[in-house]
Swiss-Prot record:
Pathway, per record: Amino-acid biosynthesis; L-tryptophan biosynthesis; L-tryptophan from chorismate: step 3/5
Entry superkingdom: Bacteria
Enzyme class: isomerase
Entry protein name: N-(5'-phosphoribosyl)anthranilate isomerase
Reaction it catalyzes: N-(5-phospho-beta-D-ribosyl)anthranilate = 1-(2-carboxyphenylamino)-1-deoxy-D-ribulose 5-phosphate
Enzyme Commission code: 5.3.1.24
Gene: trpF
GO biological process, one term: L-tryptophan biosynthetic process
This protein's UniProt keywords: Amino-acid biosynthesis, Aromatic amino acid biosynthesis, Isomerase, Tryptophan biosynthesis
Gene3D superfamilies according to UniProt: Aldolase class I (3.20.20.70)
Higher taxonomy: Bacteria, Bacillati, Bacillota, Clostridia, Eubacteriales
Family under the similarity heading: Belongs to the TrpF family.
Length: 237
């Protein structure tokens, strides 16, 4: 059963909805040009009121290790998620779990089926169907997991468009990730209607959703509950 992260939390109410529905982790976006950006002091207040055993993930793009370290300390984050072209080795000294986002070309969108707008206007992670060799050469403590997101129209991250889970090239990519031994966190266009199929086809360590549990650009309590309920269903053999 995968761990579930609700990303783009901006209010205490949204955090409470996610926790009550059974989320394992909450994501706070510290990318200034994201529409889901949250001020560190606001995130800190939300985090101070969370129950124990909920992971607190800070999402960054092209931020210096010093800047990330300050927010980690201020907000008591236990995980950072890097969405730019950062070298994970530069953040090795930070005593947190480190996740690196990797962008994979998305499946064609069937019409205008998503309410999502891109989260990150500054992300420069180049979409590719193969992992860079540098991922194979990282020293210990530099990386603890790979988050796989979708890219479309020159945008990477937060596109709201699903990944091509069924295709041979995508399945081959999953094998590459598996060979590295890093846990896979699946993102990219997940929603309550497709999450169970996505889990069955990819068997990820975790899943990450933001726009898929929103209505009119804000988190929706019923969508969060439905998403987590679907993700918790036991997959058939």
């Amino acid at each position: 059963m995968p761990r579930i992260k609700i990303c783009g939390i901006r209010t205490g109410e949204e955090a409470r909805w996610a926790v009550e529905a059974g989320a394992d982790a909450l994501g706070f976006i510290f990318v200034p040009h994201s529409k889901r950006y949250i001020q560190p002091e606001t995130a800190r207040e939300i985090i101070l009121n969370l129950p124990p055993l909920i992971s607190k993930v800070g999402v960054f793009a092209q931020a210096s290790p010093e800047h990330v370290g300050r927010i980690v300390h201020e907000c008591s984050l236990d995980t950072i998620q890097l969405h730019g072209n950062e070298d994970p080795r530069l953040y090795r000294h930070l005593s947190v779990t480190k996740i690196k986002a990797f962008s994979f070309p998305s499946a064609p969108a069937p019409g205008n089926s998503s309410e999502a707008a891109p989260d990150f206007s500054l992300v420069e992670t180049s979409p590719s169907s193969s992992l860079p060799t540098s991922f194979r050469e990282l020293p210990p403590a530099s990386l603890h997991g790979i988050l796989l997101d979708s890219s479309a129209g020159g945008r990477t991250g937060g596109t709201g468009i699903p990944l091509p889970w069924h295709t041979p090239v995508f399945q081959d990519f999953l094998h590459q990730v598996g060979d590295l031994g890093y846990p896979l966190i699946l993102a990219g266009g997940l929603n309550p209607d497709n999450i169970l199929e996505a889990i069955r086809l990819t068997r990820p360590y975790g899943v990450d959703v933001s726009s898929g549990v929103e209505r009119n650009g804000r988190k929706d309590r019923e969508k969060i509950q439905h998403f987590i309920s679907q993700a918790r269903k036991e997959s058939p053999l």
